[in-house]
Amino acid sequence: MTETQSLELAKALISRPSVTPDDRDCQKLLAERLHKIGFAAEELHFGDTKNIWLRRGTKAPVVCFAGHTDVVPTGPVEKWDSPPFEPTERDGRLYGRGAADMKTSIACFVTACERFVAEHPDHQGSIALLITSDEEGDALDGTTKVVDVLKARGELIDYCIVGEPTAVDKLGDMIKNGRRGSLSGNLTVKGKQGHIAYPHLAVNPVHTFAPALLELTQEVWDEGNEYFPPTSFQISNINGGTGATNVIPGELNVKFNFRFSTESTETGLKQRVHAILDKHGVQYDLQWSCSGQPFLTHAGKLTDVARTAIAETCGVEAELSTTGGTSDGRFIKAIAKELIELGPSNATIHQINENVRLDDIPKLSAVYERILARLLAEKAV
């Protein structure tokens, strides 16, 4: 196998316009390729979402790669320098929607599996891939549903690598070994609509909420810890009024979000918000949505193996970090003993002209292969 195979598979995946939750047979392509080296494929489709669980072997330890074949919309196609679903090599980079997030990662792991199995046909344990077409969307029928199926039948993962783009300045410089939780609130502050010249006959919800708003934004929710930054509270939307300049609004809608560390809990944050609103006499309705709990993989075998593989392949020392947004790791952690995220550069994800460095592609595949070898080979390398 030449090192161009990762590039060619990445191109084949990018050329399929799999805008979430449409898979465009990307998973079929992966299954056909991995079937040749002994992987069994199980399709787990829910609604419009396609998921596939691919596994080679029946014993522990289980090393699983998790990824998604869906991509975000392209945005204005005319702003791209080359068609987003026509993978293009230019200036030492591979351009196309999904190049960084995250079809290149998938391609690199598949080719890593091919090389590893060729060299170690009787390897220890099992290799698995959990692939979904619903990561960029609502994420309701994707990885979370597959995890439920696996959990129900007692199928657990020892080591999981999520192929999200994690590199900042150079391939391998950062490994995500955890993520903050995400808790959102949809707050409706209730008032009484009236003429702006007669405020005594109305109740302005903007005014009644203002003191609580100040306290919410100044509150120190926690101090963070050695793994996580302090919990953050951010308001994303505030809407009120009819558009007229002479009407006191009857309601104010406020949308906000917590990105919270392991120093805080979902229940605790909710209680503190309600206490602040009640303290200021706000009349309100508040709906909550938690899209993920914080999780952490402490430095251990998987992080050590990954850092060694990166050092040997890329010549850099990987930093462990929990920064950034949420990923499907929040679902997989329920059945995975150790979990990290490791992939290409995140500099252009979701952007016009999304791309990865061409010379990073064989390196990433080599990193994945070294991880497999150190975890599953008959003899560690």
UniProtKB/Swiss-Prot annotation:
Xref: InterPro entries: Bact_exopeptidase_dim_dom, DapE_proteobac, Peptidase_M20, Peptidase_M20_dimer, Peptidase_M20A
Cofactor note: Binds 2 Zn(2+) or Co(2+) ions per subunit.
Gene Ontology terms for molecular function: acetylornithine deacetylase activity; cobalt ion binding; succinyl-diaminopimelate desuccinylase activity; zinc ion binding
Residues the record lists as binding Zn(2+) 2: D101, E136, H350
Class of enzymatic activity (EC top level): hydrolase
GO-annotated biological processes: diaminopimelate biosynthetic process; L-arginine biosynthetic process; lysine biosynthetic process via diaminopimelate
Superkingdom, taxonomy of origin: Bacteria
EC number annotated for this UniProt entry: 3.5.1.18
Cofactor requirements of the protein: Zn(2+); Co(2+)
Catalyzed reactions: N-succinyl-(2S,6S)-2,6-diaminopimelate + H2O = (2S,6S)-2,6-diaminopimelate + succinate
SUPFAM superfamilies: Bacterial exopeptidase dimerisation domain, Zn-dependent exopeptidases
KW Amino-acid biosynthesis (keyword) present: yes
Positions with a binding annotation for Zn(2+) 1: H68, D101, E164
Protein task: Catalyzes the hydrolysis of N-succinyl-L,L-diaminopimelic acid (SDAP), forming succinate and LL-2,6-diaminopimelate (DAP), an intermediate involved in the bacterial biosynthesis of lysine and meso-diaminopimelic acid, an essential component of bacterial cell walls.
Subunit composition and interactions: Homodimer.
The protein, known as: Succinyl-diaminopimelate desuccinylase
Protein encoded by which gene: dapE
